[in-house]
Amino acid sequence: MAVYYSIRPQLAEIPAPKNEDSQSSLPHIIIMTPEEAANGTFLQTNMYVKLEHSQEVRFCKAEAHKDFLYGTFVIPPKSNNREKIAFRYLIAKDRIIFIEDGGFVKHMIDKMQQAILRENPGIGFFFSDFLDMLISEDLLYLTEIENQIAHLEDEVLAGTLENFNHKIMACRRKILVCSHYYLQLSDISNILQQNDHGFFTRNELASFRLFSERVGRLHEEALMLREYSTQLREVYQAQIDIRQNKICLLYTSPSPRDPKTS
């Protein structure tokens, strides 16, 4: 069943209205399943069915349509036991609708409900807070990747080269996914800042700019990790070359002559 929140200084879950036309004038959040979205009057009016069936959720994006913003999120896994998370969203003048089928968005909003208070709440502030929550633990995750690379570096310098390529490629794949993710989030923020529909106040636009700066720093961190991993691969290759040279010398060096036979 769809879940409704009223955007107040502190987010508050509210009962579902009997029909969509009876919703209050206060800005609000709705979380619904794809099935509920396909049957919703507001979403049908705004051509959600056409959008839903014509586009597969593959990456993070935002699109400006006539009277609303529509987009998708794909959150990359940040642990070994979690798959990527995908959901859709729609932003209108007085509401934000999330379409998901797994409970991730509700979990995030429940965390925001406990942690965030705003004197002047609005849909723009809510969405910027939501974006911030998405990346709140990413620096820690990037630090974990850095520690993994540093551990590999210690192994290489100690002469332990077993499964190095497999391990470093796993790190580089994580870095690449994060790098693309941050660029996509930056694109979303840029589209929000254009404010084509006039949904957001000046202060809300400033909060999107701050998010852009945060995600930009994360992207820079990912690029530095990629460079670190590249340098480590070069060190590893140098170690391999040294070993191969020693083996070649062993087989090509003349054996010492026996003085008795000379």
Explain the meaning of each model-derived region:
Residues M1-R118, Q184, I188-Q194, F200:
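Helix-boundary and N-terminal cytosolic regulatory elements
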